[in-house]
Amino acid sequence: MKKIVFTDHALIQMIRRGISKKEVRRIIQNPGQTDQIRPGRVVMQSRIIERDRKSEIWIRVFADVSENSIEVVTAYRTSST
């Protein structure tokens, strides 16, 4: 597995949006869907069930992928794909 690193921007946005590093790592390791949006940049997403809200959401993770690492650029929640 490649090393996963988080940019300062990603960490700030994840805190603001209530997304944990654990959730992001889980999505990177087992994404429901992955799309390359430009060379080296991918968006990975997975459907998550929020037990407290009893709702289904998607978490999207944007990352720059290199030979040795995955650098998380940002992550956010959305209600649809």
Where are these regions (language model features)?
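Ribonuclease/tRNase effector modules and their secretory precursors
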Residues: 1-81
